[in-house]
Amino acid sequence: MRIDVQHSQHDIDDELDTLYERLHQPGHRLHGLPVIALGRSGLIVRHRKADGEYFLYVEDPAARQLAGYTVFNRLPELPRRADRYLRAPHTRLRGSAQRKGLATTLYRWGLDAGLCLISGARQSVGAARLWTALAHDYRHGFVDVEGRALRYLGEAVADDVHGALHTRRLLLGNGWTLGELAQATGMTGVDAAEYANVNVRRGEHERHSVPSVGRARPVAHTAHVTHVAHAPMR
């Protein structure tokens, strides 16, 4: 996965203007989409699903323009089992709508609904920062998709592995554990990577904590998980 994407803001604004016209053009397939208010922001979100992909169009009614959109795409390089559960978010924002937490809100909608997210082969600097921020609140890691096989690599990878186009980031939606996702998608490598992650965390803890003689106890590895339906978003 490479952090090398750069966008032309002029082209993005033109695309958003074209989409806005289609959303308000009677007879067009984008006309009359369902609407959800985006909190107290004054913005609204028009949404649709097509061919297993989810489209969120964020409209600013006062300005009569689109602030941006997010599409949760299917990835052709994923195995069929994984395609049912993983989507790759793709976002475009108008310049005036950037750095206001809009993309974060839309990604959280998907994650909180139980959708698991996977990155594309390339990201912009802004997208990479967003994924890193979300990783503080959601289970995360890296996966390898080479040969249309999904293999878990752990919560951190070496620089050369990170830079490979078949390495992707992963964010788990609400209610999922790595084990459940591995079982649902056929993802391999979870047990080995989890063992490595535990050893790393244990080593860091031992380096930064003061030993207490006679009070050592095993680390609990179980946690209560509130489960949600693991079917794809509808």
Short names for language-model regions:
Residues 80-95:
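Conserved acetyl-CoA binding element of GNAT-fold acetyltransferases
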Residues 1-81, 116-234:
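Terminal substrate-recognition subdomain of acyl/acetyltransferases
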Residues 93-112:
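Conserved acetyl-CoA-binding loop-helix of GNAT-fold acetyltransferases
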Residues 88-92, 112-120:
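Short acidic, glycine/Ser/Thr-rich loop/turn "cap" segments at secondary-structure junctions
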